[in-house]
């Protein structure tokens, strides 16, 4: 029921005048709640986590990074979510590169990167980024009703560990063939 209300809401929004904060507050925050994440729980949300960049190769014009969201499952970060402004419909490889730097930080070590500008949400596996323009899962306004269950299976606090386990088993099976 709540998922249906969210997808109905999603289909109606014009994100063209949304800045990054609007995307975060009006779209991502409710989505994280539906996915089962909440502050001060075992499946919590770390917001705007600031981290120091210590390695010279990490420092690309800055010494600190700030991660928009790092949802946790059993207090461990499996993924990060980076919000992007809605006034730019297409996210690009620069957005993914920024998020990759965040996800691979030694204090985070996330398995998945999620980029969201409201128009669409893209999920990348940190260890399987072969094509920077092709996420392993993408959902947009136009297909949110048909793909929301799959999004839930991948990112929800209840199902992510099982999804990750299946993904690892599949990769291992391919490797051992």
Task: Explain the meaning of each model-derived region.
Residues 1-112, 120-177:
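A short, conserved, highly charged catalytic patch centered on acidic carboxylates
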